[in-house]
Amino acid sequence: IAFALAMAAFAAVGLSGRYPLVVVVKEMFTGLDSFPLLAVPFFILAAEIMSTGAISRMLLRFASQFVGHLRGGLGYANVLTGTLFAGISGSALASAAGPGAMMARMMERSGYSKAYAGALTISVAVIDPIIPPSITMIIYALQDRNTSVGSLFMAGILPGILIAALLAAVNWWISRKRNYRSLEPRPPVGQMVRNSFAALPALLLIVLIG
């Protein structure tokens, strides 16, 4: 699509004869000459590295110790892990392919229906473009010079948390209706402290990147 649009624009300018082609090239580079735009490829790279590394497992272990003992605990862990990962990646695809895919497989093995596991995982991934850092918000801010990237980031925090809370409420209702069990008993306090320290690098990334 991008190449088709570019070729159509070049053809229109060339046939009209009103502007030299060098103006089109200059405008293309001017549109990309933006410091905030540099964050987009690095966010994508960070999300890909984190989705294939140990950070997803750290966040999963950290989230499960708080909600895994509840009825439908894997669903809650899916929501909480995805929300935490949203503060790192900013990419819905990275969330669905990384911690989302891991959680969906665990839910299926634990007796959750494949349809529900997939639906919940995809719904949680939608939070990523809302909670900062958000690639979508950066691109939107570049189109309007009166819009601040920081203001958009601040505006996305509360809606993202509300969506996560609503997904947790849906999981509560479906888990009671379908009698989904808890993931595991609540771990001892010492184990929770060790898990929290192990997840500290991932949690610090949320603060640094956000």
Positions of PLM-derived features:
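Alpha-helical transmembrane segments of multi-pass membrane transport proteins
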Residues: 1-210
